[in-house]
Amino acid sequence: MPVQGSQRRLLGSLNSTPTAPPHLGLAANQTGARCLEVSIPDGLFLSLGLVSLVENVLVVTAIAKNRNLHSPMYCFICCLALSDLLVSGSNMLETAVILLLEAGALAARAAVVQQLDNVIDVITCSSMLSSLCFLGAIAVDRYISIFYALRYHSIVTLPRARRAVAAIWVASVLFSMLFIAYYDHAAVLLCLVVFFLAMLVLMAVLYIHMLVRACQHAQGIARLHKRQRPAHQGFGLKGAATLTILLGIFFLCWGPFFLHLTLIVLCPQHPTCSCIFKNFNLFLALIICNAIIDPLIYAFRSQELRRTLKEVLLCSW
């Protein structure tokens, strides 16, 4: 969702300082600092959004079609796909509207454009917040399934999962509305950053604990079968690599955006921070890339879901 046109404001306030946005570029020029600015064309935004949209629509359709996938785990995966779908869809809508406005193909009053922009703001922000929440919910669900396997079905029931999903969506919408209304308050931005760090720590702690338990389990099996130590080490390295990829992708895709928010609070007028602000569009593109990667990590690895997806595609043809 690039912030280039005069009518574009969706999260555009984050692409400048809250106090004096026009001076960002001037500060960089005065100091002679060289800024590395990565330009993200509108066509690339539309392409990334379309890929993410198709992927996540397929995930939601497959889970809705197969009753065997109507479990708490797939409920969270479906909601994650829906959140990513909304992130991509709202981004594509905003980009398309701005392109039409700039080309003169769409005529609209400023008040109408402002209202549309506000709606897209809320959809985008709430879907981003809910996406982070559902990533955390999936981690908690997997943790309970491993460490409380015998009690899992009594702890994580479908009604409880549905209540959790409803609470996440309601909270995401409410907080996104507060964020849009009070985006120029440092406390609001810091709350978003703290929320991201909390999700990162939660996922890291849970997945690392799960990896340690899996390695201990593999070591016990190796002792029973009197296998050599390298086999256990190989399993540990594979698990560590998988964990690194999972958390690394999460941090690389979401981290720059929340670093941007942090710098707005800490150094809004500093030339170096001003250079980082210029790459706001890149940070948003990384979030859309995360929406593309999420189905590959959490959904398409399921054999049952892939089988249902094949049936859906064959029936559509």
Curated annotation (Swiss-Prot):
* Lipid group attachment sites (S-palmitoyl cysteine): C315
Extracellular side, ranges: 1-37, 94-118, 184-191, 267-279
Entry GO terms, CC: plasma membrane
Kindly report the protein's main subcellular placement as a broad class: membrane
What compartments host this protein? Cell membrane
Residues carrying covalently attached carbohydrate according to the record? N29
| One annotated GO molecular function | melanocyte-stimulating hormone receptor activity
Q: Which PROSITE patterns match?
A: G_PROTEIN_RECEP_F1_1, G_PROTEIN_RECEP_F1_2
Q: Name one Pfam family in it.
A: 7tm_1
Transmembrane segments annotated in the record for this chain: 38-63, 73-93, 119-140, 164-183, 192-211, 241-266, 280-300
Q: Which residues lie on this side of the membrane: Cytoplasmic?
A: 64-72, 141-163, 212-240, 301-317
Q: What GO terms in the biological process aspect are recorded for it?
A: adenylate cyclase-activating G protein-coupled receptor signaling pathway
Keywords assigned by UniProt, alphabetized: Cell membrane, G-protein coupled receptor, Glycoprotein, Lipoprotein, Membrane, Palmitate, Receptor, Transducer, Transmembrane, Transmembrane helix
Q: How does it sit in the membrane?
A: Multi-pass membrane protein
Summarizing the function annotation, the protein's role is: Receptor for MSH (alpha, beta and gamma) and ACTH. The activity of this receptor is mediated by G proteins which activate adenylate cyclase. Mediates melanogenesis, the production of eumelanin (black/brown) and phaeomelanin (red/yellow), via regulation of cAMP signaling in melanocytes.
Q: How does this chain assemble?
A: Interacts with MGRN1, but does not undergo MGRN1-mediated ubiquitination; this interaction competes with GNAS-binding and thus inhibits agonist-induced cAMP production. Interacts with OPN3; the interaction results in a decrease in MC1R-mediated cAMP signaling and ultimately a decrease in melanin production in melanocytes.
What's the family? Belongs to the G-protein coupled receptor 1 family.
Kindly provide the name given to this protein in its UniProt entry: Melanocyte-stimulating hormone receptor
